């Protein structure tokens, strides 16, 4: 299936270069409807989901200035035995994009790896602790700081969520001089190919700067407004931007209490032959001049990008052409000169009072350990597709 898609994309590119016109619309509809019917409606594996996803593009409405507005895009979901399935060749269905969406949601497996690493003076990356978890692609999302909220369509951005992140990454702590690294790998069901679709990292110093700023600001506000009666669990959600701004990952960050037992110093950690001390030295590109003190594999910029439309309805989505602009551009440095640009999302719940947490925070040492729990990774559909079909970068953390 993937080979057929690659061949068709190459054929369209060659034809466009020769004629300058590209393929006729009817030719494209015939091919992509055939692909959809053959690989998703007919070839159904026993363990495969019985859902079908369609990308519908509704006619654009005329704007107030008389110009035609942008077409609205919706994702429709049906069971395979539904009598309401759109007819093959329906002109309002984007069949090419529907094939891509079903491919990413149903034909691929995904493994995310979160690791605590350090960088040597020679530029090598040493992995001290890592945890891999299977995740699933979804065209919808829900807030990770509250349970039971209704999911919302996020397409064309695909989410890979870890709902039980506190359990999965329970012993993932980061300290001074370390960094948290994230890698998401896609592979087909037969394991004939695999490719990295997301890589990113954040240094402890940058993570702690954001965390301390948010907790102290929230504590000061609560001290004035609640007289210390407001209960607060000091967990903050920080976003990690991918390379070249491609998608982002979210980390749930909280302080390790002094009574907790550090995962470091165990028998496994002290063994030089342990996988915990795996050394990674392979990097595809040299560090850029701006980041000559860190491998270019990592993209530590954390300034958050903000969705363009916060009030979109559940079934509405941004068009795939907008996926690169789904968030506003941000600076490409990793030093967090302006922490206030990051949106603060605090997890409210039971625990010690906010004021007490803030006072304790000010009394603790500067380099306290932090829990760093990966909550999700999100990427635009077309960027995932490009990495799968064209790039196929080899994993580093999973190697």
From Swiss-Prot:
Biased segments, Polar residues type: 255-264
Stretch list, region Disordered: 254-335
Biased composition (Basic and acidic residues): 310-329
InterPro entries the UniProt entry points to: DUF2045
Superkingdom: Eukaryota
Transmembrane segments: none
The protein's name: Uncharacterized protein KIAA0930 homolog
Organism expressing this protein natively: Xenopus laevis
């Amino acid at each position: 299936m993937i080979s057929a898609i690659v061949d068709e994309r190459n054929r369209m590119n060659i034809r466009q270069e020769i004629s300058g016109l590209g393929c006729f619309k009817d030719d494209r509809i015939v091919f992509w409807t055939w692909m959809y019917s053959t690989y998703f409606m007919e070839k159904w594996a026993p363990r495969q989901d019985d859902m079908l996803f369609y990308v519908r593009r509704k006619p654009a409405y005329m704007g107030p200035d008389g110009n035609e507005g942008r077409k609205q895009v919706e994702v429709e979901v049906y069971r395979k035995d539904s009598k309401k399935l759109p007819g093959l060749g329906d002109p309002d269905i984007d069949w090419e994009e529907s094939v891509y969406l079903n491919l990413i949601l149903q034909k691929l497996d995904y493994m995310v790896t979160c690791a605590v690493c350090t960088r040597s003076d020679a530029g090598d990356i040493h992995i001290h602790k890592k945890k891999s978890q299977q995740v699933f692609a979804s065209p919808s999302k829900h807030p990770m700081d509250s349970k039971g909220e209704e999911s919302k369509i996020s397409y064309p951005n695909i989410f890979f969520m870890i709902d039980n992140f506190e359990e999965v990454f329970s012993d993932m702590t980061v300290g001074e001089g370390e960094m948290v690294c994230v890698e998401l790998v896609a592979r087909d069901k037969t394991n004939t190919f695999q490719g990295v679709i997301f890589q990113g990292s954040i240094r402890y110093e940058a993570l702690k700067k954001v965390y301390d700023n948010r907790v102290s600001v929230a504590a000061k506000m609560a001290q004035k407004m609640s007289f210390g009666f407001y209960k607060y669990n000091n967990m903050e959600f920080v976003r990690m931007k991918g390379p070249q701004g491609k998608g982002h990952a979210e980390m749930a960050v909280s302080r390790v209490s002094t009574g907790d037992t550090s995962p470091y110093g165990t028998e496994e950690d002290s063994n030089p032959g342990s996988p915990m001390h795996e050394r990674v030295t392979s990097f595809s590109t040299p560090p850029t001049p701006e980041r000559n003190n860190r491998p270019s594999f990592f993209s530590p910029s954390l300034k958050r990008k903000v969705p363009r439309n916060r009030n979109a309805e559940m079934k509405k989505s941004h068009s795939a052409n907008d996926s690169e602009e789904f968030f506003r551009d941000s600076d490409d440095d990793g030093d967090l000169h302006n922490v206030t640009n990051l949106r603060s999302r605090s997890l409210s719940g039971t625990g010690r009072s906010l004021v007490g947490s803030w006072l304790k925070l000010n009394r603790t040492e500067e380099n306290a350990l932090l829990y760093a729990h990966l909550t999700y990774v999100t990427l635009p559909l077309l960027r995932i597709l490009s990495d799968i079909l064209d790039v196929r970068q080899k994993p580093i953390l999973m190697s």
